[in-house]
């Protein structure tokens, strides 16, 4: 693991993999042994976790810094959505079935 303060891509991939595994395990219906991935609920849960973690950083110590942090996060999110969408379009769709639903504000 790299020193704190230096971005560790391997650690990032490890956390990403653990999160996806936890999402799949939490989504399994034991009666059918299938997992329905509910995008709205998953996205909201991950956003809440991200916000909690970001709130602990020194970069979130003032309203101006919080706004900058949120704008940087939103920009990264847009870039990742665009890249993932392009990859799915190229590959013929997502790697799993998706249940589309309206997003809620819960």
Predicted features and spans:
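Solvent-exposed interaction surfaces and binding hotspots enriched for charged
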Residues: 1-106
